[in-house]
């Protein structure tokens, strides 16, 4: 009976951080696109097309519902559509519900996010919008088997006890006698890439003093690890007519720290304008800075054109500044699976005035082959590909933090890159909170020891100074000599 009373539903609280559009739909994600119209790269919302008169011709979050097919009256759908769903007529005399992005089902009766609470465990259910091909996991427990999500018919489910998977237990919250249990899951819409458009689902179960599960929709705070951004290197071929710069939006200084979703840009200016007058980026790849088999690589630009992944990550098209000249690639900060580091490799071609090979080509080109994972003997962070006389290979590294997670910033351990570890900035080694606390404790201990030692020394000196020499009153003084007679034998 008590188990039955304890069962209830808890509200999933969403932290969408940089997500300006709906948390469930964002056309900037690789698995969510606009059916018609265009995607606004800033808001993540679809801009639906209009008819000849300037009126919208489509509606719904993905602009997938033609207004001409919306049923009128809405009661033609029987049973009626729920939760803001719209009744429409896909074919003659056939009526269906088009759901909003947060619900699904024939009547839009099911929320995509749902949490079940019982007396000893929590179950998180999430039904992504179809074509989802990403990854869902409990924060800080991505590789913990008992915390893993399983998928069945599009539904992702994870069940674990309140003592597992980092569940935070708070007593006497929200009221005296209550117990609150809270945990968070990350929804990555691309299994290899972490972006500001990803979601953080926070579920909270509240068991009150009477043993009933209560709904809770309070949104907590998100702590940000305020560590400095670590831009490491610019590695060029022998001749350096161009450079690779990571900048903030509109060429502003990089934000500190760099968080997922921050607006950044790659700026590649032509430094040698005496010999060359034009440049073109032919390839741009990125990896997570780790050694095989943990290395993840993605190609953003191939043969001068954006790939599908590049289209999702790059804001707008590849642009240029002919006055410099320079290549400009705007993007929102992201990172790849397994590491906060994002290492870029750009292949840039430079041309003289009469050379036409730097002129923009027609896109798209065929998709690039799948990236080849390096063998352990290779050094992916330092490898240089062959380049022709008028090609330059540039490298740059960025560290991106996730403000929605309490993770600690750890650089990936790459055994083959010992030199970079030896040359690490000593100041970065002190940026760990635990190390700083230990240093402070040691300093305080040393100061206390010095104070105690000083006090003991002063006390000892005073005691010696206060000693008084006691003389016998019968003992002669001055220069008199005391003679002791010898015994007669």
Curated annotation (Swiss-Prot):
It comes from the Eukaryota. Residues 1-23 form the signal peptide. CDD domains: EGF_CA. Residues 404-420 have a biased composition (Basic and acidic residues). Keywords: Disulfide bond, EGF-like domain, Glycoprotein, Secreted, Signal. The keyword Kinase does not apply. Glycans are attached at residues 229, 414, 479. Transmembrane segments: none annotated. Residues 358-389, 404-425 are annotated as: Disordered. One of its GO terms (cellular component) is extracellular region. Component of the acid-insoluble organic matrix of calcified layers of the shell (at protein level). It is found in: Secreted. Its main location: secreted. Residues 363-374 have a biased composition (Pro residues). Residues 73-109 form the EGF-like domain. SMART domains: EGF (SM00181), ZP (SM00241). Disulfide bonds join 77-87, 81-97, 99-108. Residues 116-370 form the ZP domain. This is EGF-like domain-containing protein 2. It comes from Lottia gigantea (Giant owl limpet).
